[in-house]
Structures are given as C-alpha cells and as structure tokens.
C-alpha cells in the first residue's frame, strides 16, 4: 500500500492520507500539461466506474489522524469533493494530484472529535461510502478544552448514524489514561453512561490506552498522570 499526506492552506500543514496500491502521480514539466500515471507501472491508468484504479487497486482516503478535518476544515473538504481532485504535497517541490471523485474513491474515512461543523453539509456526502471514526470520551475541559458539551456530541453521533447507518459510525473511547481525577472507577461509570446513550447509534466501539512515549513520561508529573498500570488496564477491560 502506498501512502501520502496532503498539504493544504499555505502548504504548512499535512493532514490527509491516501492509500491504495495504484498510487496516482502527476508528471510533466512545470506549467505544461500533465498526465496521470501509476507509480507501480508508469502507464496511463484510466478510472473505471467501479471505483478502482485498475483491477484490484482500491483507493482509501483517510482524513485524518493528523488533524480534525471535519471540525476545522469541513468547508475545505466539501470544496475538494465538489472539485473532484485533491493535491498532496510531499516536500517543497513535489506535489501529487489525486482524483477525488465518487467513482474513484472506494471509501472515505473521517476521523473526528467534533463533527458539528460538518452536519449542515451532510447532503454533499450522501452517496459516498463514508465511515466515521468518532472519538467520544467523558473527559472534562481540563483535558479537552476545545470541545462542545458532550451531550451535543452524542446528538451529533446520532445524526451521523441516522444519515449513514450505525455500521458506518465507529465510536472510539480513547485514549484511556489514569490520574487522580480520572480513576479506574471513573472510566467505568463514564463508559457505562455513554453506552446507554449510544445504544443503537453504533455497532462498534474501539478502546485504546495512552501510549507512554518518552517525551510524555517526562511530563507525567506536570500532567498528573499515573504511571502505566497493567493492573488498571486489566481491571477496566474486565469491568
């Protein structure tokens, strides 16, 4: 699988990934006409109405683990959908243009903590094979200061489920960490409360624990986090 990261705005932020075995690459002199080629063959690759870049070459657009595009760039995303193409900046000189159309894309995966800015534009997404990776926890504003009230987000998830189906809305309860304010028992109570509100809204829930990278470990005293506790993890998963 080939991958890429999209640069948009002024080219300083990378926020988009494109995955597929038939990576489409723009070639040609600057200012001249360019044609679309596949990296693995170098031959012109016509788009098929099956949504494939050639036989067996699925195209997945994932937007994105690097930033919350539905929250901050929903207008940009919809503009790209209407334009039918998107440019990917790999470095200062190299830019790849991808076809961004319903016929070419097999799945559009949107990662978000707050889809509210996108809800008024859902009509543009109808007909697209969308999957939403929706992160929703009970952390308060000391951890997630930029989010709306959690009950608003529950209602937003319900709207996505009604529009696209419960199987296309994946609930992510992550990352899980433990501190004085967020204990094992707190997570159990919070998770139970959310599952009651989200009954029938989603069919899948993903949980994961905070990765304790060296840089984060140095900040643990300031953040008030407890050390990585295998016992606490087992207790939460067994609850």
Stretches found by the model and what they are:
Residues 233-239:
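A conserved mid-domain beta-alpha-beta active-site/ligand-binding segment of alpha/beta enzyme cores
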Residues 2-8:
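Extreme N-terminal basic, low-complexity initiation segments
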Residues 152-219:
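Conserved C-terminal portion of the radical SAM core fold
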């Amino acid at each position: 699988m080939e991958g890429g990261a999209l640069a948009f705005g002024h080219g300083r932020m990378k926020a988009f990934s494109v995955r597929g075995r038939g990576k489409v690459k723009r070639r040609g002199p600057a200012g001249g006409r360019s044609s679309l080629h596949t990296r693995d063959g170098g031959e012109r690759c016509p788009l098929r109405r099956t949504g494939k870049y050639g036989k067996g070459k699925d195209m997945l657009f994932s937007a994105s683990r690097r930033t919350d595009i539905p929250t901050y760039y929903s207008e940009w995303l919809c503009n790209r959908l209407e334009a039918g193409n998107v440019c990917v900046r790999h470095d200062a000189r190299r830019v790849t243009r991808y076809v961004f159309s319903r016929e070419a894309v097999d799945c559009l995966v949107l990662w978000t903590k707050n889809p509210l800015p996108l809800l008024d534009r859902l009509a543009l997404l109808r007909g697209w094979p969308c999957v939403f990776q929706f992160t929703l926890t009970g952390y308060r504003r000391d951890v997630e200061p930029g989010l709306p009230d959690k009950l608003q987000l529950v209602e937003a998830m319900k709207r996505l489920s009604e529009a696209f189906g419960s199987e296309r809305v994946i609930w992510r309860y992550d990352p899980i960490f433990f501190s004085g304010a967020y204990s094992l028992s707190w997570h159990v109570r919070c998770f139970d409360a959310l599952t009651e509100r989200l009954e029938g809204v989603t069919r899948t829930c993903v949980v994961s624990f905070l990765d304790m990278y060296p840089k984060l470990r140095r900040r643990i005293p300031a953040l008030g986090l407890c050390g990585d506790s295998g016992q606490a993890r087992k207790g939460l998963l067994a609850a």
